[in-house]
Each structure stands twice: as C-alpha cells, then as structure tokens.
C-alpha cells in the first residue's frame, strides 16, 4: 500500500491535497507548514490514523474531509490552522489527541456528513479544541480529564507560528 512519508510536503507551496484510494497511511508532519494549503480531501483513502502535526501551521487551510475508516486524530494534527472552518469526520472516529485543533480560531463545524451517523462517543484529550473561539463542542465528544504534572501546561511557542527548516520530499512512489 502507498502512503505519504514523514514530512513529505513539509513547507511546500501546495494548495490542495487529494490522495487516491490506494493510500493507506500518512506520516507525521506530512503537510506541516504548507502556508498555501487550502483544502484537504482524504475521503477516498484507506487511512485509519492521522499522526502528530500532519497539517500543523497550515494557516490558509479552510476545510478537511477525513477518510471513512479514520479512528484516530493524533496530537497537534491541525495546530494553529487559524483559517480552518470545517472538518468532516467519519463515523468510525473514536479518539482525538492533545491540542489536535488548538488555535483553530475559525473552526465552526466538526461533524459527519449525516448527523444520524454518530453511534459512539468520541474521546478527545482535554485541550484538543483549546483556543477554538467559535467552536461549540458537540454533545457526542467527551473531553478526557487532564493527566500528569504538565497536562494543563500550554506552551505559547506551540501556538505561534515558528520557522521550520524542512524540505519537501520528492518520491516517485507517490
């Protein structure tokens, strides 16, 4: 099965990401810091987890369509995606990581295509939606209690944009 390796498009000037059906995985930081990325559509893929920082700091990102078999959204997946307004989720989603949508100031819609499809609770780390000023948590999202000595700590440097030195990878296997 094909997939995007870690940092595949990190810092690249791509505007859209739409992966074909034979993609089964995506690496951490695959599209981190893609300042021009506006839309992500993974609906046709077999991806079951989004690892950490997949789309972090994509400041123009407006909409993400997640794949139907996705069960896990990792930590800081969309950290500081300040333009993100909509995330279309699958009904299989069960876990949302720490600061997954932290700083997504415009986030308003986080839902499946059909509201009737939600059959289970989605567990989210306690600050998964921190600094999402326009977001109202759906009743089917359960925020987990904070754990550990640093669980309530929030590092301002994570929220603010920072320079990332990474080069997009070119791989003929894609």
Model-derived features: where do they sit?
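Structural signature of tandem-repeat unit edges
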Residues: 1-3, 11-25, 35-49, 59-72, ...
